[in-house]
Amino acid sequence: MNKKLLCAVMFSTSLVSSMLCGCNSTSNDGKVEVELIQYKPEAVKAFEKIAENFNSTHSDIHLTIQSPNEAMTVLKTRFIREDYPDIIGIGGDINYSNFLDADMFMDISDFEVVNDIKPSYLNMDKELEFIPKDGVYAIPYVANCAGILYNKDMFAEHGWEAPTTWEEFNQLCQTIQSEGITPLYFGFKDTWTCLAPWNALAVGLAPSTVCSSVNAGETTFSVEYREVAEKMKSLLQYSESNPYAYSYNDACTAFARGESAMFPIGSYAVPQIQSVNPDINIDSFVFPANSDEKDNILNSGIDLQFSVMKECKNKEAVYEVLRYLYEDDTIQIYLDDQNAVPCKEGDFTLPSMLDGVKSYIEEDRMADFHDHHYPSEMSVDAMVQTFLMDDSSNAIDTFLSKFDANWIRYNRDLIKKVQDYIRGYNNEI
C-alpha cells in the first residue's frame, strides 16, 4: 500500500475510538466475515435490509455493512492505521481519484457484473483517473441526475411545454414571467447550490474531459467554460429577487408551495420538496444548453459505487457479496428507498420525477458532474457565487482568469505528475 500517497490525500481527522477489524477473517462459527463501509448514512435502512437478506440466505459468509456519519473521515483514519474493510462504497468524485492514485483498490475487471454496467458510468470512472490505469477499480451502483425540476400541474394548467433547446428555454422563462410567475428558484445563499445549474450547463457545453485536458496543458478554462459562464449569468434574469438571500431549504419550500415554476437542482432534492408538499406533481427535463436537442446531455453522476480494497484476503467471498448487491432485486431496494438511478442495465422501476429524462438514461446520453473533478480546497461553489454577484462589465473575464489561476494553484503537483507522464509516454512511442 502506498502510504506516502495516502498521507498526501489525508486531511486532518480525529481518531475514531471504536472500529471493527477489517480485511475479512473467519468468525468462531466458521463463517467468512466480510465488512463493507459505505458513505451514505441516509441509506442506512436500505443497507440494513440488504445485509439482513444476504445473511439469511448465505450460510458460509457473514456480511456487516456500516453506514457511519462522516464516513470519509472514518475511512481515511482507518486507512492511515492500515485497518482496511473489505469493500468500500463511495461516490464517483475526487475522493475516489485520490484513493485510486494511492493504489488502494484491487483490479476487479474479472468480476462478471462489470459487463452489465452502463458504459457512461464506467467511462466516468476512467475519466476520474489522474493517470490512465489498466483495469477496473470500482463498479458503479447508483447515480443521481441534475437538470431542471418543474411543477407538472402548473405546466399543464398554463399549457407550457418542457423545452428542448436553449432558445425554447428562454422563451418559456419569458412566457412564465409575463404571467406573473417566477420561472426559476435558486437558493444561492448556500454556495453549493450554485453548482447545480453550473454542472447541468457544463455537461452540454464543455467536454467531459476538460479538467484532464487542462492538467495536460492542452486547453484552459477560459476557453472551455466561457459559454457556460455566459449562460449561467443569463439565468439570473429569471430568478427570485435576490437569490443570495435564500437557502437551499428556502428554495425547496418555495418550489413546493408553487412560488416558482421550475427549480434547477438534482433529483436528490425531491424528498425535501415533498416533505413540504407531499402532493406536488414533479417531473424533470434535461437542461437544454444547446440550440440543437441532439447536443444536450443529461447531467448524471455516480452517487455510490463499490471498490474492493487491495489488501482484501478473500476475494471469492467478497465477489459473492458483490454478486448479491448487484442482483436486480437488491438494487431495486435501494432505488425505492433513495429515488436513485441504477448504473446497471436492466428493467428497473424509476421514480416518476425522472420520466422527462428517462430517454436519456435509456440511451446512455449522460456525462458526469464537472465538480466531481474539482479539488474541495478550491471552493469553486464560492467562486461561482462571487461571479454571479459581480455586476461589472468584465465579470466573466475576471471569473475565468481566476478559475485558471486557482486551478494551477491547487493542482500544481497533479499537473506536474500528469505532464511528466505524458512526456514519458511520448518518449516511449
Residues covered by each model-derived region:
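Mature extracytoplasmic/periplasmic domains
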Residues: 53, 104-107, 268-272, 304-378
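Extracytoplasmic "Venus flytrap"/periplasmic binding protein-like
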Residues: 53, 57-121, 153, 157-158, ...
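A structural signal for short loop-to-beta-strand junctions that line the ligand-binding cleft
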Residues: 77-78, 85-86, 115-154, 182-186, ...
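Hinge/lid segment of periplasmic solute-binding proteins
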Residues: 91-146, 170, 176, 197-199, ...
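Extracytoplasmic/periplasmic solute-binding protein
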Residues: 133-141, 146, 170-217, 260
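Conserved C-terminal helix/tail region of periplasmic/extracytoplasmic solute-binding proteins
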Residues: 156, 332, 363-429
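Glycine-centered hinge/linker elements that transmit conformational signals in sensory
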Residues: 175, 215-244
